[in-house]
């Protein structure tokens, strides 16, 4: 077949596909209009930079996982607050039946506008999510958590009944169904997941996430969040030091890390990140316990400087802007070359 005949055959095939499935259903990649990936901020300056595009991408599946009390729900509530600031409509599928509205409000979530569902079974949770996503009116949906998506067969069965891989099958089927709708409606779908230990692992990490392997493959971004220390005021613990690692990223280079403080009652400390990243990039000068900006001392001790930045938002915003402009340097500093994904 000559090149001309090939081109005619392809053109006829493309025309037939467009006639059957609508305009835009198939095209050459070069003809597709290039659109920059839109992102929603995570509420953490360091994590936004680590993700490479300024936040989590729209129209993608995201997995946030970690041990108990590591800050998974706090991070997703910040995501909702940031999406709502941009005028987005958000939904929260609370399969764990553990969402605290008062805490969500403290983190900046408009609880009057947040759609919430507390389903009885895993099938019900995923059907509700599917219906909301297909509506086209939801910008972000959070499913908390994969471990709590218990199949109906398990709930209706007897205690001790073996339900081998029923949850993994449920997740695999649901994700096959959801993926196309998520992409078409540009809805961010965030799954919160827990960590379990694999039995009999001799080499490598024994940790794994619940719900089988399907979510690992379908997720465009996977974020591992860990509590690495406590923040104390004298003897009282007032927060936790947190490390996040982007273990999978289909929209930017993976394995970047970020550190931030989660303060009890108020969530991620933006001021703490501005200080740490400012010092790292030589925007804020640190001499002993004193911190200076533009040769002017702004406080002694990290907690005092955090308070100063809270009271002077114009200086805080100015430093943040410079940090974002120099973000490429931060990603080089935070790049973890040793990380590998186990899927």
Curated annotation (Swiss-Prot):
SUPFAM superfamilies: P-loop containing nucleoside triphosphate hydrolases, RecA protein, C-terminal domain. Pfam families: RecA, RecA_C. Coiled coil: none annotated. It comes from the Bacteria. One of its GO terms (cellular component) is cytosol. ATP binds at residues 66-73. Signal peptide: none annotated. Its main location: cytoplasm. One of its GO terms (molecular function) is ATP hydrolysis activity. Can catalyze the hydrolysis of ATP in the presence of single-stranded DNA, the ATP-dependent uptake of single-stranded DNA by duplex DNA, and the ATP-dependent hybridization of homologous single-stranded DNAs. It interacts with LexA causing its activation and leading to its autocatalytic cleavage. PANTHER family: MITOCHONDRIAL DNA REPAIR PROTEIN RECA HOMOLOG-RELATED, RECA. This is Protein RecA. It comes from Rickettsia massiliae (strain Mtu5). The gene is recA.
